[in-house]
Regions:
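Short amphipathic alpha-helical interface segments
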Residues: 2-32
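A short, conserved structural fragment
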Residues: 49-59
């Protein structure tokens, strides 16, 4: 997984970290939470796919890969410990 791409989007949209690994996420729900338009959300989705962070689940939703889940867990632990 390309963590540079994931970190770029997590830094830009901190709310992503709250729901990225919550199961199957629809593009519509993600764009409503992030308050972005559908084309921007689709471009973000394509970057996540090519980075190996998510897998497509149908045509309009995604699921986090194991690598992304582990990465988010690590980030949360570091934030909790103040690193």
């Amino acid at each position: 997984m390309d963590t540079v791409v994931v970190k770029k989007w997590l830094d830009r949209y901190p709310k992503l970290e709250n729901f990225m690994d919550a199961g199957t996420i629809s593009l519509k729900m993600a764009r409503e939470i992030l308050d972005v338009d559908r084309y921007f959300m689709y471009d973000m989705f394509k970057e996540f796919i090519t980075a190996g962070a998510v897998t497509a689940s149908g045509t309009n939703s995604w699921r986090a890969t194991k690598e992304l889940k582990d990465y988010l867990k690590q980030r949360r632990e570091q934030a909790k410990n103040g690193n």
